């Protein structure tokens, strides 16, 4: 997930006719905590119209500022400075994650995030 956009959604849209009748799901990975309201917002923004019925799963990932492009690093640093000025009690989950990772790396990966997707896969076997 990058700025509420899920990488690869365009591939689904472009190939939706080829995928008709096949089981497919979306696993989105991002830095934000698994907040149900945020996840639902991302799902609705990305899986619209004929993609709305595709199952959507979320897993929290990792953050490494050094692996980002110069433009992304610069944008994230500016955003972190802006968010740091806010009242901590008013921060959204993604803003808290942004500050938590400030200036370096963070790894929030956990195999448990994959369990809902794995259950969905096993149901179709």
Where are these regions (language model features)?
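FMN-binding flavodoxin-like domain, especially the glycine-rich phosphate-binding loop
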Residues: 3-125
């Amino acid at each position: 997930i990058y700025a509420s956009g899920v990488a690869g959604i365009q591939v689904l849209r472009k190939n939706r006719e080829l995928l008709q009748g096949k089981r497919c799901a979306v696993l989105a990975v991002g830095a934000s905590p698994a907040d149900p309201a945020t996840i639902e917002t991302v799902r609705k923004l990305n899986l619209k119209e004929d993609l709305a019925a595709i199952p959507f799963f979320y897993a929290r990932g990792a953050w490494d500022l050094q692996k980002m492009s110069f433009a992304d690093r610069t944008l994230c640093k500016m955003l972190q400075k802006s968010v740091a000025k806010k009242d901590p009690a008013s921060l959204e989950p993604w803003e808290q994650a942004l500050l938590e990772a400030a200036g370096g790396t963070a790894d929030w990966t956990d195999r448990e995030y994959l369990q809902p997707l794995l259950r969905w896969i096993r149901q179709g076997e």
